[in-house]
Amino acid sequence: MYSRLFYLKSSYIIYFEPLFSNAIINILSFINSLASPLTIFCFALSAQALSTIFYFRIFIFIFHSWILLFHFYFTCSFKTYEHQHSKMVPAYRMQSPRALPRTYLYVWPYK
């Protein structure tokens, strides 16, 4: 039903959405919407200019693959959380000693 970030000892789930504010999610979603056409343009431009040099070809391939994976990851991560904020009710919350003040880690029981 909901996407899960990771499991804690197979009995608890930490969801991705409560750890970040809506503002951060919206900014990353906006950047993600620009990523695909910008990636294609930059890759085509750099590949045409540097394709004669072998090491640059390897670099372009790795860099382009990383951008595509980044784009795919955020597309999958944020798409399911756009309209689900009111449906998610935590079982309990903990305050992390390493987190900012008034920042809580919400944990849901695994069902």
Swiss-Prot record:
Summary of the tissues where the protein is detected: Brain. In the hippocampus it is mainly localized in the granular-cell layer of the dentate gyrus and in the CA2-CA3 subfields of Ammon's horn.
Listed GO CC annotations: membrane
Keyword tags: Membrane, Transmembrane, Transmembrane helix
Topological type in the membrane: Multi-pass membrane protein
Compartments, as annotated in UniProt: Membrane
Membrane-crossing segments per the record: 23-43, 58-78
Membrane in keyword set: yes
Coiled coil: none
Main location: membrane
Entry protein name: Putative transmembrane protein CXorf1
Organism: Homo sapiens
